[in-house]
UniProtKB/Swiss-Prot annotation:
<protein>
    <recommendedName>
        <fullName>Oil body-associated protein 2A</fullName>
    </recommendedName>
</protein>
<feature type="compositionally biased region" description="Low complexity">
    <location>
        <begin position="22"/>
        <end position="31"/>
    </location>
</feature>
<comment type="similarity">
    <text>Belongs to the OBAP family.</text>
</comment>
<feature type="region of interest" description="Disordered">
    <location>
        <begin position="1"/>
        <end position="31"/>
    </location>
</feature>
<dbReference type="Pfam" id="PF06884">
    <property type="entry name" value="DUF1264"/>
</dbReference>
<dbReference type="InterPro" id="IPR010686">
    <property type="entry name" value="OBAP-like"/>
</dbReference>
Length: 252
């Protein structure tokens, strides 16, 4: 299955498959024994990598092969250093949110060091930040401002592993490359998605846009091969194909 497949055939892993309409993954309710085990493990284990997520950012993403397909995303951000961040991406901020992918975020310095072929997979963040689409829910504007100035000059590579927008109840098929919203009409986020997000958090994207007029955008918003589709009108999709395994002699 390619990441560009529009809709898998009905299965128990898709909405309506198995006779239900829920978008929750198929499976039995968590047992009391499993809950007790989870509580005990959480008390004894450090879970250090997970606990490094210090920020929650909400924005929108578009499929690279079909920008008409758009999803609201919730990034839980870990900062490995000032030039590299890694994000677990969920479909909501609820306790039962589904992990739909991962995004890596790098500074312009790191982006410029990448070969052209690799740069094609990365997108810029300047427009979605200045337009008010990117927000840190419940974070005061003054505290958010310094981070926005920094993030406006960064680049991301986002792989979506669970296409929940088409009703998949499980992660199906190959991962899909995602791109960021842009000023180009072909990459404008649907107003209904923005309105739904704004109503939930009690904010206004239009007001955020006005408040961010002084956010410093990079002089060159699409350097190198960033936002490849904007210039070439071609996206990227992943196909899974059989391949000969490398064979190694057994150890003596």
């Amino acid at each position: 299955m390619a990441s560009s497949d529009g809709k898998p055939l009905p299965t128990p892993a898709s909405v309506g498959g198995g006779g239900g309409s829920s978008t929750a993954p198929p499976g039995q309710p968590t047992t009391v024994a499993s809950k007790v085990l989870d509580m005990g493990a959480a008390a004894m284990q450090s879970l250090r990598p997970v606990k490094q997520a210090k920020q929650h950012m909400c924005t929108f993403a578009l499929y690279a092969h079909d920008p008409k397909r758009q999803v609201e995303t919730h990034h839980y951000v870990s900062r490995l250093n000032q030039d590299f961040l890694q994000c677990a991406v969920y479909d909501s901020d609820k306790a039962d949110a589904r992990l739909i992918g991962v995004e890596y975020i790098v500074s312009r310095k790191i982006f410029d060091s990448l070969p052209a072929e690799e740069q094609r997979l990365w997108h810029s963040h300047a427009h979605e930040i200045k337009s008010g689409l990117w927000t840190s829910p419940h974070v005061a504007g003054l505290l958010e401002k310094a981070e926005l100035d920094h993030m406006a000059a960064t680049f991301g590579k986002f792989w979506c592993t669970w296409q929940v927008d088409r009703g998949d109840r499980l992660p199906l098929g190959a991962p899909a490359l995602m791109v960021s919203p842009q000023a180009d009409p072909a990459a404008a986020v649907r107003p209904d998605l923005v309105r739904k997000r704004d109503d939930r958090y009690g904010l206004s994207t239009e007001e955020l846009r006005a408040a961010r007029a002084d956010v410093e955008a990079p002089a060159e918003e699409h350097p190198g091969q960033a936002d490849y589709w904007l210039r070439h009108r071609k996206g990227f999709a992943v196909d899974v194909v059989p391949h000969e395994m490398k064979r190694h002699a057994p150890f003596p």
